[in-house]
Amino acid sequence: MCDKPDLSEVEKFDKKKLKKTNTEEKNTLPSKETIEQEKECVKSS
């Protein structure tokens, strides 16, 4: 094995073969209101 990678495959790669995908946000961060509500619930218990 040599230290340099073989770039011939990369040079031949055709971007047109890639499919466009729609990204979906899965794990959204809670809003400030939600965080405050949870903090109050913990304090009151």
Curated annotation (Swiss-Prot):
GO cellular component, one term: cytoplasm
Keyword list, A-Z: Actin-binding, Cytoplasm, Cytoskeleton
Entry-linked Pfam families: Thymosin
Family, per entry: Belongs to the thymosin beta family.
Gene Ontology terms describing biological process: actin filament organization; regulation of cell migration
Chief localisation class: cytoplasm
UniProt-annotated stretches for the region Disordered: 19-45
InterPro entries on file: Beta-thymosin (IPR001152), Beta-thymosin_sf (IPR038386)
Record has Ribonucleoprotein as a keyword: no
Protein name as catalogued: Thymosin beta-15A homolog
Database matches in PANTHER family: THYMOSIN BETA (PTHR12021), THYMOSIN BETA-15A-RELATED (PTHR12021:SF11)
Keyword Cytoplasm among UniProt keywords: yes
GO molecular function terms noted in the UniProt entry: actin monomer binding
Protein location: Cytoplasm, Cytoskeleton
PROSITE patterns noted in UniProt: THYMOSIN_B4
Protein's job: Plays an important role in the organization of the cytoskeleton. Binds to and sequesters actin monomers (G actin) and therefore inhibits actin polymerization.
Biased composition (Basic and acidic residues): 21-45
